[in-house]
Amino acid sequence: MLRNKRKAGKLVRAPQKAARIDSQANAHAEDHSDLEHSAPSTDDGFDEPKPTIAKKVSLSTAIPKKNKFKQRDDTKNVKPPTLEEMKELRDTQNLFHSNLFKLQVKEMLEELQLKQKYTDFIENWLESFTVFTRQLKDGLMERSHLEIPLKLSQKPTGFVFSKPTREPYLIGAAATGTLLGPKIVVDVALEMPKESLHKEDYLNLRYDQKRALYLTYVTERMKESPAYAQDQFNFNYYANNPLKPVLELTPGTKQVNKHLQVRLFITAPLSSFKPGRFVPWNNNIRPSYYGDEWDEKEPLPSTQHYNANVLFDLTLSENQTHLDKAFKGRRNFQDGLLLLKVWLRQRQLDIGYSGFGAHILSAFIVYLNTQRILHHSSSSYQVARTVWNQLANTDWTKGISLSLVPIQTEELNKFAEQYDVCFIDFTGQHNLCANIPLYLYQRVREEAKLAVELLNDMKLNSFPLIFMQKCPLYSRVDNILKISNYSCINQMLTLHSQPRFKYDFAKYGYPQLLQLLTELLKKGLAERVHSILPLETATPAWPVENKAPVIGNYIQLGLILQPEHAYEVLNKGPAANDDPEGAEEFRRFWGEKSNLRRFQDGSITEAVVWGSAQDSPAKKRLIVRQIVLHLLEHQLQLDSKDVQYIAGELDQVYKLSPWFKVNKLKTKLSLDQDTDAEALSPHAIRSYDELARQLHGLNDLPLEIVSISGVSPVFRYCEPQPVLPQARLVENRILTSSIQRVVIQLGQSGKWPNELSALRALKTAFLIEIGEKLEAQCHLHWMMSADGLLVLKQGYCFLIELAHNKELALLKQEVTERGITTYIDNAASRSLERQHYILPKVSGALHSLHQTYSAFGSTVLLAKRWLATQLLDDGLWPDMATELLVAHLFQQRYAPQPIEAPQTGFIRFLQLLAFSDFNGELFLLNFNNSWQEQQVADLEHNYRSNRQSYPPLAVATSYDMQHAGRLWTSEESPSQRVLGHVTRLARHALEIIETSLLSKDLRFVRPAQLFRASNEGYDLVIQFKPDLVPNSLSYDLGSPFVSFSQPNFNLTRAGSGDVARIVGLLRSAYSDFAAFFYNPHGGKELAIVWRPPTEFAAKPFKVTELQACSPCGNGRVQVIKETLVEDFKLLLKDFYLRIATPEELKREQREHQKPKRYFDAKQTEEKSTPKPKVRKANEKEAPPKKKRLIKSSALKALK
């Protein structure tokens, strides 16, 4: 037993030592980092083993039982495990679900430790600043050269500066030892003496004015001091609060100026005012201060938020003192708080006026310690886990308290009634969560609950999901509402904000808007919305010489929808007979949208209808948008043009092209011109279902059809091209724009031949017989092709393939030199197995996923369209890889709520491409949890140990069997270069989206900005003949090379796929010399990038290296680009129109030359072009119609 423990102990320690060596090497290699690797703490806060356990162990090793049989004693040379080894082993087993997770946490904590140079600088700076404050002198503040960082309604006069009587001190993370990079912010507090304040300064913002003046005076003296001559001075608002200006000082020292910033707060002692002056139910801003009249008989409205704003300063010193006592010398608490801060920052829940700051988490750790939920010896992991667990399971809306003096339940309830969230500080006077809205607090709880669930999932490495992945709040919401029009903001505040909110927030517009809009939307959307979250960005700092900016005239809200109710087309009100007052209120709230309606159950009630049940999914996803805009217009008099509601803007890219007219289609289906690929998929699926029933019902087949599976993307709602019923039979040929593949399997029989070609011939005979039966019994047209049986049904073309296990076995069969038959996987067998056996299962699983998450299919459509418009076809980036990566997003719990908006799903897909570690991460989709935990662990272990045997992008499903990780992608598709290219494209796209989303002035990104490739970086562009390449049926956002012109929607012969086939030939023959890019969705240009010049250098003549080479003398050969271009033309044959460089095409655009892309393009004439073709186009030549008339009259004369 001890021997096993000892071995396990070694296994635990060895990776730690290796990880420590690696981390130290990285620390030496990256000296510019603002973080350093400190030696791990010997006291990690875990419980030491009890002495009784140690005694038992020593007894069992010291007095072994005698055995009468002579045995070899293996324990003589084995040292007993140390207490530390036993402790680490027990901790790994009991606390962490894997040794890897523990090592990752430990390594991250070591990397987060502050470098000594920063610690020394902070101590020295604080000492020098203390000396500086001692040198300050009392006096009247005269005219300042700096602007006061506060918008004052009255100009201050006669401010007398009093020298601080208390030395400046560190607050926040710098005091608790939990500073976090990459930008280290050191908070320093300077306390105004009590003499600077008068007893009436609690009223009408006087305290805030004096605080700002005090800060201005200290800043001006600092700028005059030689000690700070090289430093940069800026003012900023703490937490976007215009009443909380702070000084941001960037030191001029080169060693730290890039990564460190000092922030100076001005505070005041708690004894400056009478106790109870700032309790939440008191009023400290009189209506007369803003020129308002108030009835003296009415009680003054409470100013609980303003009171909390002042109490933040007054209680800061005492709160910090207690936090310092709790964290000082406790590395486990400090490291636990660091883990929580990383988690919070990655989710951007700590930004802005309503942010859930890290100081709340530090106070909560102390609270849990005082409640004996956390122990002093708890490890950092236990601290973080306990905080998450308690956050998820405690309710702060009823109030919790850290007060040293016990607070009565009635008083705590009275406190809690004034705020959405209540957490009383050590003084018992200040609510630490005064500015946090209810929805944001609930969001924090949900994220904490998710973190605990991820930790409990033994099948998952939860470390990157919790700590490494960036989860900006805008990527967690489904819809976004932006209001930035200054006049509209003022109008809303003036007409609709209640006076008590104006006094409560000291006329600051942002929280008033947040309160007004949240209440309105909460009432109007009700069960349709899960959360309404403020999306804030930090206010930028400004030079101390400039005036303070006006903030709060802009608001942005994120809506997380409730999938069960968000898309309901009806708002049903109360019945007028039963509840006349309720019905009247309903009509007043909804206005003209409300109508009296009679329902099938006989009830007659007020109701609002937002659409019909037959509307497309895209239209239903905009119902919430319709409701919000109506409420803003009806209740707040906001016109829709003054509001930006972001929902479904990118859906345009998979809509049907407006150039294609559906009314010309001969079909019984009722199709709308404004339809899209998502709405058209059910029509194709219903046609497939009917075909499947007809196949099952065929009579007199030699073998019964036992399985039918649709494997085309349309059957799982993943086809970005609108699939229209336009296939038709013309001169015994089926013309169509797309083919839907179907795989069938027949019943068992032992009469199938054992030779591959004979078996395939028999399969063809079976398919022909099925076609004849379909024609005879179901009146369907059919044709045979090289790939299978083509069947025309209801305007759709289906390709039926026959799968048989023996064909797969014969493909794998090989005979050795000794005549032994072996079965070995090869490219052909893997392709057949994927197409006929694995893809049907995966396709069914993805279809089921779409039924569970309605946004899955449309997210795939956006992802596929984006990749295609970046000139990445299936040969460079497999379509199935895109589908599986999106499915991975929906399967993994990255967020507390599933994705409801395709636009949000697309943003998360871009984040996945931009920030994933493709070299170290295997994307596994365990459909229906069909793989056991051990199978998943074995695959991941094999992936890590044999990484070089897997493709650059490794995607696996639970149906892949022995091919897991190697089936859906390959070394060339996508290659390492293409993967890097896609990563850069995704990061650039995210930058564009984030800039447009978070900017106050910009509107949301237009689809053309994302879904059109750049025309930079290509060497050549080959244009195809436009009449031979049909346009995409989806909305065309244009080519990066050539302007728009008349589109071409001609149908091609079923199964031709000429462009894709030719590009595949070019890649197979010339991929060593050039890379080929084109848009598979109707692209009419082929962009070429040459390989590096070394591939075209002259080299010695070798028989094995003569591909595409030409002799260049002296027994050497060389690949010549001009020769390759001629080869490209030869392979393209009739498709080739002309070849040009991107620069030439740009010049044509600038010179307004006629675009050479579509029907009006004239083919570039070669020297060998015969002249009669030119004469044929001559308008002066006699028309052929005249010739026919002459010929016709001659024929009549012969009669």
UniProtKB/Swiss-Prot annotation:
GO biological process assignments: ribosomal small subunit biogenesis; rRNA processing; tRNA export from nucleus
Region (Disordered): 1-51, 1146-1199
Organism listed in the record: Drosophila yakuba (Fruit fly)
Reported function: Part of the small subunit (SSU) processome, first precursor of the small eukaryotic ribosomal subunit. During the assembly of the SSU processome in the nucleolus, many ribosome biogenesis factors, an RNA chaperone and ribosomal proteins associate with the nascent pre-rRNA and work in concert to generate RNA folding, modifications, rearrangements and cleavage as well as targeted degradation of pre-ribosomal RNA by the RNA exosome.
Name of the protein described by the UniProt record: Nucleolar protein 6
Compositional bias annotation for Basic and acidic residues: 28-37, 1146-1169
Keyword ATP-binding included in the entry's annotation: no
Family matches, as Pfam families: Nrap, Nrap_D2, Nrap_D3, Nrap_D4, Nrap_D5, Nrap_D6
InterPro entries documented for this protein: NOL6/Upt22, Nrap_D1, Nrap_D2, Nrap_D3, Nrap_D4, Nrap_D5, Nrap_D6
Gene Ontology MF terms in the entry: RNA binding
GO cellular component, one term: condensed nuclear chromosome
Comp. bias (Basic residues): 1-10
Known partners and oligomeric status: Part of the small subunit (SSU) processome, composed of more than 70 proteins and the RNA chaperone small nucleolar RNA (snoRNA) U3.
Recorded superkingdom: Eukaryota
Location of this chain's protein in the cell: Nucleus, Nucleolus; Chromosome
Family: Belongs to the NRAP family.
Keywords assigned: Chromosome, Nucleus, RNA-binding
